[in-house]
């Protein structure tokens, strides 16, 4: 009976393992990868919380201080003990002059704008990083595919040579050379697989998925159209990294206004009630009750010139950095457009004049070897050249794609995904 139970348990375990289905791979295009990153990336979520923090600070600014309740009581028990006493109750409130509370709210609202722009810029940078990581993975895969295609041809050649060697038509040395080249290619492909896995790992971190999730890249490495839009004022106003300097200037102006208003401290208004009982020998006991109003105005002797000078310097700093950022954006657009166009031209020339020709030469040497007009060394020399040209073509194609994407983000033409 015990043996039957053990066998049954083993069978159930086997069936459970056999019934497990591997989760389908996550299919990703460049666009879906960006959308996933904007939803899942934890660093981006941390930046977004800065907006809530700024809103919290703004909600606390521009408020009156709490009113103050006062109560006083005194008597002459420890002295003459004639029954004299006094009572005083009051409520006071401080009121700012010159709209200081409104200016505090202005500063708080500007801080919210700055936090929002920081989040938008983080989204822009993350989107660019994701697209570059996606392209990097595609490039690694294209390199591996190029080697795999030549590996298949090399393995077929090795089989042909082995069959010919058995008929004493070629030497065993040539067979070993072909097998050695196949093994070398297999090792390179294994290294490519490691590089591809590392590229996918970086992509997974950016899009915020588990390292255990399988990813299937839905696109292949291809030439990306070059944006034709030109630099304009709208480009600047669409770039959050430039807008932040504009808002920084606005923030300095708001803080200067707040400092000027703060030179006049709050006016304090108090409503009070007093009651007292005193004893005078000729008159006897007398009672008094008073309801009054008082206010106090601090004199504006305190100077905020140092703080104002600081904000004036920060305003000039923001203006200078805004101009520098504008020049940087213009230079980036010019450079990325130049590189994208140049790489597109190089790619076209490379495909027609180099890659296709090297493939034809390799094919001709292969035919010549089969017809005993060329040796194996000539074939593998042409093979090495053709492989190198294919890998160079992959590198050029990847650079064209990267610069086209960089130009798109420099022009602020990225998809306006929901943040």
Pin down the residues of each PLM region.
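Periplasmic alpha-helical coiled-coil/stalk elements that build and connect Gram-negative outer-membrane
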Residues: 28, 122-238, 336-343, 385-386, ...
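A short glycine-centered flexible hinge/capping loop motif at secondary-structure junctions
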Residues: 165-169, 368-375, 410
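Small/polar (Gly/Ser/Thr/Ala-rich) solvent-exposed segments
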Residues: 45, 64-84, 94-121, 243, ...
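Acidic, low-complexity, intrinsically disordered peripheral segments
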Residues: 20-23, 392-419
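Residues on the lipid-exposed face of transmembrane beta-strands in outer-membrane beta-barrel proteins
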Residues: 89-93, 203, 293-299
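Positively charged n-region of N-terminal signal peptides that target proteins for export
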Residues: 1-4
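Bacterial Sec-pathway N-terminal export signals of envelope proteins
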Residues: 18-73, 94-95, 103, 169-172, ...
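Hydrophobic h-region of N-terminal signal peptides that target proteins for export
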Residues: 9-17
């Amino acid at each position: 009976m015990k043996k039957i139970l053990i066998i049954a348990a083993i069978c159930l375990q086997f069936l459970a393992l056999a019934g497990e289905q591997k989760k389908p791979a996550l299919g990703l295009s460049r666009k879906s990868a960006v959308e996933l990153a904007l939803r899942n990336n934890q660093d981006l979520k941390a930046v977004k919380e800065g907006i809530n923090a700024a809103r919290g600070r703004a909600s606390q600014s521009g408020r009156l201080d709490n009113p103050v309740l006062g109560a006083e009581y005194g008597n002459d028990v420890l002295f003459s003990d004639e029954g004299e006493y006094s009572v005083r109750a009051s409520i006071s409130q401080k009121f700012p002059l010159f709209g200081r509370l409104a200016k505090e709210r202005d500063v708080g609202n500007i801080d919210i704008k700055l936090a929002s722009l920081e989040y938008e810029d983080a989204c822009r940078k993350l989107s660019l990083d994701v697209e570059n990581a996606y392209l990097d993975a595609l490039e690694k895969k294209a390199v591996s595919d190029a080697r795999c295609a030549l590996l298949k041809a090399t393995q077929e050649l090795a089989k042909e040579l082995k069959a010919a060697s058995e008929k004493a038509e070629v030497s065993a040395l040539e067979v070993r050379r072909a097998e050695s080249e196949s093994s070398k290619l297999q090792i390179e492909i294994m290294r490519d697989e490691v590089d591809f896995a590392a590229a996918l790992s970086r992509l997974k971190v950016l899009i915020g998925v588990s390292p255990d999730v399988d990813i299937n890249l839905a696109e292949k490495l291809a030439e990306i159209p070059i944006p034709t839009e030109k630099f304009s004022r709208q480009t600047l106003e669409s770039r959050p990294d430039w807008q932040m300097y504009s808002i920084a200037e606005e923030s300095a102006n708001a803080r200067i206004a707040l400092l000027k208003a703060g030179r006049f401290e709050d006016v304090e208004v108090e409503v009070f009630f007093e009651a007292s009982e005193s004893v005078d020998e000729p008159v006897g006991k007398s009672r008094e009750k008073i309801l009054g109003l008082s206010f106090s105005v601090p004199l504006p002797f305190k100077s905020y010139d140092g703080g104002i000078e600081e904000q004036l310097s920060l305003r000039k700093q923001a203006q200078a950095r805004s101009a520098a950022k504008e020049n940087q954006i213009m230079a980036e657009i010019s450079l990325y457009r130049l590189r994208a166009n140049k790489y597109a031209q190089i790619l076209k020339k490379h495909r027609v004049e180099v890659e296709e020709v090297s493939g034809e030469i390799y094919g001709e040497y292969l035919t010549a070897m089969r017809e005993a007009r060329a040796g194996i060394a000539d074939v593998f020399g042409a093979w090495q050249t053709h492989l190198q040209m294919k890998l160079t073509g992959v590198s050029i194609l990847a650079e064209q794609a990267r610069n086209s994407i960089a130009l798109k983000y420099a022009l602020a033409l990225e998809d306006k995904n929901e943040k």
